[in-house]
From Swiss-Prot:
Disruption phenotype: Exhibits lower chitin content, reduced growth under the stresses of cell wall-disturbing and oxidative agents, more released protoplasts, a thicker conidial wall, decreased production of amylases, pectinases, cellulases, and malic acid, and increased citric acid production. Reduces drastically spore production. It comes from Aspergillus niger (strain ATCC MYA-4892 / CBS 513.88 / FGSC A1513). Glycans are attached at residues 312, 833, 961. This is Chitin synthase C. Belongs to the chitin synthase family. Class II subfamily.
Amino acid sequence: MIYEMMVMKRSANSRAQNNRRSERQRYYPYEPTESPSRPVSSLGNVPTIPPPAASTVDVPHYTSRPGSPTRPWSPNRVGNWARPPAPPSVASSQYERADLNGSPRPGTPSSRYGGSPRRPLPPAPLFSAPGGHDANIPINDAGDDDVFGGGGRTIDPNNRASMQSFMSESTIITDEKDAMSKVDLDDEMEETDEMVDPNIHYGPAPEKQSRRGVREAQMSTKEVQLINGELILECKIPTILHSFLPRRDDREFTHMRYTAVTCDPDDFTQRGYKLRQQIGSTMRETELLICITMYNEDEIGFTRTMHGVMQNITHLCSRSKSRTWGKDGWKKIVVCIIADGRKKVHPRTLNALAALGVYQEGIAKNVVNQKQVNAHVYEYTTQVSLDPDLKFKGAEKGIMPCQVLFCLKEHNKKKLNSHRWFFNAFGRALQPNICILLDVGTKPAPTALYHLWKAFDQNSNVAGAAGEIKAGKGKGMLGLLNPLVASQNFEYKMSNILDKPLESVFGYITVLPGALSAYRFFALQNDAEGNGPLNQYFKGETLHGQDADVFTANMYLAEDRILCWELVAKREERWVLKFVKSAVGETDVPDSIPEFISQRRRWLNGAFFAAVYSIVNAKQLWKTDHSLPRKILLQIEGAYQFMQLIFTYFGLANFYLVFYFIAGSLTDDKIDPFGHHIGKYIFVILRYACILVMCLQFIISMGNRPQGAKKLYLSGIIVYSIIMFYTIFCTMYLVVIEILARTGADTSLEVSDGLFVNIVMSLLSTVGLYFYASFLYLDPWHMFTSSAAYFIMLPSYICTLQVYAFCNTHDVSWGTKGDNVLNMDLGAARVVNGTTVQIEMPSEQLDIDSGYDAALRNLRDRVEVPETPITESQMQEDYYRAVRTYMVSIWMVANVILAMAISEVYGPDAGGTNIYLAIILWSVVVLALIRVIGSTTYAILLVVQKIVEGKTKFDAGNLANMSHVSGSSGGRSSTALKYGGGVSFKDKFAEAKWSAKRVAGKAMFWRK
């Protein structure tokens, strides 16, 4: 009985298993049905795609999505396999392929689908009728205006035996291969069944892991007509991108233009290269040329910047009442993206550009007609944008078309070379009015570019404008929990409230940040002799060896400061620089110590040496056409910068002396807050800790990179923070006990009057000034969220950053080295008879034999290998290191002598008799007073400008109303009402206001 039950149970299991197997093998044609997770496609009728060209190859593909139909049967032998016929129901159905030429089909950003990442159509059935490959892009495009010629033939790089075989390595699914070589132990197979040979050969081993549903692109040899001897291609955009574009009425929307540039950027226009804005139906004038420079930033930083730029273009196109902008304002804007090095650019950034239609893989060449390609230029007018979340935004979100020029430099030659491509190549070709510079990672506000442009439109003397850079605080402002981010946020805010407005009033801003700034292209041009701002600006790229002294080399680390000075000091011109507070851009600041130190090393060295250069060459200002009051203001600004330079140079000693005198005051037993000489012990410990950390900073900075000594630098910052915290405590304690003594609350505690006054005035000129200016500009929140972190980390700014910067003056790199190696990974395009482009390879066996014979001769003759001489780069590095040693030694000795001399003359208990401490504290007061005057003046001028603009708009409205009234009433009666009875009181009042405004305009000489 038990045996019969086991047999029946086993038979039932076998039938159930057979039913499941037959259920899997049964094929059901796909019919789209609505489900909660995936609604029915809203496309309706699928557009008919033209049949493929003869050069395409029908390669079946499998979808790996869940729920896709599976193979209905598996052959037991490879040799007797035949393709099963397609069911009639499948042959008549329409579907969307799971891939497009081997690439996964992306989500559609059309408004009809809401930007959903899901495919809008159902996947293709596993076995389809002939013609299921109609989604392939036709390779042969017969057209008179197409630069591609006919006669192309497909190249099979892998030399597969059969592209139609389902056993091919590139098409077979891993699960099926495993099923063919495994035996299901749960199945009772009969002995007559034959197993598939597990050692069957499927072709060569793949070079990399293959992905399901992905087909590698097939290359073909084509004949291409050269234009002026250069390789210029018009390539169709991907079909899926073309399918949802709102506009397809012009070639700039349907084709991407590729140009292989084989010349130097200075010779771009002379060699006859032209951009789309110079030819055909796309010939246009360029008002704004936007430069976005990038190195190895990822796709998140790139999309933040690019999406912000496209939002600004949308805003410019929405200004329908503007004389310059409007619905077609995008035609006056060109976005130029320059990548510094093809091998350095982030692959996913290229993917993002490809998604926009700007970039296509596999069309670039290393060599054209035996000339090395220096830059690959891609041009396309995109109609979609990618936001930082990598979601498509199109016309449904207000995105306007954007003319994109993507320059992919073949070699990594640093940022200055990228700017040379921008100004000397593309700028000369397009002749824009305004050039805007952006860094990848900076997100401009939706109206930032308009406000920058408006500054030039309102004042013809403005040659450059700087926007307000804000530090990124992260989601929910959680980044402020990091003291490094909080301190930088405070620093950026106070610079935009105090420093930039002051410099804008003078007319010379020391630095227009490369992250968000603008220049008038005409003002940048050199004179007839080749001298001018751009000539001086690009000198830093060609300096080598001892010809580039260390001062000049470090000065060009802050290349944006060079342009600022050269513009203001341009001979026989009267250009000024302006700060535009309404042009806001947000950038990510370093949140780790190594990145922070490396960034500030370049900034500090560049700022220091550029300030020295501007002070030494201050006499150039008298050769300009600035008015006399303007020249006087610029000289005053030069004196202010000189004072700042002195404080920077002796910042190390001044910090130690301030700590020595203020913290040393608590060593007196009368005012010791702790008692039992604890104040004296704390002072001695912190004093020696300060000296020890300073000495260690020199050793670490001259021998270690921040990335390799992160803990050492972190330890130094912590010690400096403790010292600063104790110094602040001592300062507040001295002020409190003096106030108590003066009010009579506690007469036993009293400090000298001089020390009290000095401390109070210094506090008012720093903390008080910061609060006043922040509330004046209605932006005080950083005082409550970031000021504490800034004051605690202030010694690290003075000591750690300055020591590392001066100890690395020999390092004049941007963190990258020039790349001059010729890569041939893209192949070479060789011109034959002036028309045909072919790939270079040995033509006959004789060529291979000749190369082999030459190698044998060199081995037989033992040709002496010459010694490698000392390279120019090594000589340059040795020279810079020697100058670094001398400079650091002089700087360190000067600070030590000052600190030792003052500490010997005045003891820690000198109090009010310490003249040097009084000079330091009152100097802080004077510098702060200059900053607050400049900041207040800028705020007043800003209010006056807004009032004048409002008055102008109000008068224009009244004039329009008066014209309307006079036109609608009777002619003679209207004239009598207007002119009869004398002048009205309203006219007299308007004339008086006009006269007052004219007098005020003459008085504001600083705006000339």
